[in-house]
């Protein structure tokens, strides 16, 4: 016989029992909610008008029927909106959707519950089919109808529910068949779904944020120009410093070429101390204009205009002219100062002060940038500094600019960017922030997560077909699609890749076609259309006579330009929605790996990301939720990545994905040349001479497919 427990043991056991009593227990479990980023720490991104696909695993004990709904709230909404979720047996998962019809910050969450009436109704139906007695079940149904009547404020619904309860319990005057018929009636089911309150309603503990941006954040063609170089090139004469009016004269041609955004490097007064000369010389001449990234002198800082460009009124006129042509102006937002910037005298503590009292200039050893002082965004007076940096953005928004290309954000405190972007977009949700961060992938991803609308990419250094395939697959078919919008710039004032240096004009045409068809966001810097490819020295990515340090007027219509390519490709992008999406990109086999072959599908797949794994929403569910509009066109793109030699291959067409039978011929039309080809089956022949064309952009002509059948 075991010993009697000591009193102390008994007391401890009782205390333990009290401690283990649950304060609150949820009968229904909601988990694996999508979309969400890092457990809800950061918002996911969408574009206004998008239908957001939502998913969740909803679990409980037993076999009762469950119900679930998406709760969403848009900007300035006073209350939550609910939309039902649908259950898929095969994936054992719930799916829902809602449309984000305004820009700004949205939030959503999931609610789930035991659907008592649906559970009761299903059991009743099974017992009726089995010929079992259901009198007690009908009484239970009557009780639920009365409960629902007490919770509704709709008089007609209350009356109908009370009448139903009476009918279900009426054994004397109502035939059993009629009572059963009413119990299983679809109208009653709908009524109960609306008015019977769940007894175990469970809400997912987090509200997930979605940042909804305007359309230009997803699809746009960017063009970078220095206003000071937009003058006429006169042989034998020194170049004249351009103005905003000179730059405005170029806008009609840029609009004609199909660009959407005109991006300007810094337009502020340029420092004089340690001013850089031509080709980054440390010994400038008297007429050298300096680098516009050395911001500020006695004429002002980040909220001032370089007088050589014009006045603030001239800038306002330039912005207005651009808008009148369907173009938007983007400004460079570079948080750094020249030694002559007003802030250096007014707030020396906003910079890194060395032990000898001097201010630390920018450097990336062994490189030195004596003309630039970095700001110390983690200084003791950072609240005032952060406010001043925010006010710069707000100032230019006041002058019609709502797109900012941010210079080297990875060298500033991440917490600052999350704060300043949130501050600006709270008041001006239409504002776009573009991160110019060529750094480690995790740092680039972090900037995108914390708020940057779009980001530069490694595209410039991805030139072989396998590199492009691998990198673009990461951008478009990984969890990065929830937060990272890559803008594929083909060149920048800092980056002239050797592919362009050694590949000549055909290489420029190849890179243009790739960037503009692989991504809805792409851009170029002035001179690309002229195939400028002379580096300052062999092996360098710096341009000779770099426009960063001197005036570079050009004749943009000189022989050998690729303007016709630009206009045609941008026209294709605008006319066909398939080139305005990301996730509809898929790569397919080319038996010659030098030729890259890919498809831009007529619609984006409905995919949810659970961790690093994709979960495709079942087609029937997606269609019921409003996805799957197949009204667009399918495109097949073949590009020769070798700019020197003719290449030929057999490409493997994904005909089954496009709904084309194995033995059916189909017509593809090249939108670059207007040539038509009749293909059959999966394997088809492609030959590309880079001196004639960089590739094909095939439109699959579905009417022709039907005619050939």
Predicted regions and their residues:
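Residues immediately flanking
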Residues: 333, 437, 492, 640-641, ...
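Alpha-amylase-like alpha-glycosidases and glucanotransferases acting on alpha-linked glucans and related
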Residues: 292-320, 324-327, 337-564, 581-582, ...
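Carbohydrate-interacting/catalytic domains
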Residues: 1-228, 232, 236-260, 269, ...
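Aromatic- and glycine-enriched glycan-recognition loops and surfaces
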Residues: 228-331, 385-388, 417-418, 505, ...
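Glycine-rich, phosphate-binding/catalytic loops in enzymes
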Residues: 125-126, 279-282, 346-347, 421-423, ...
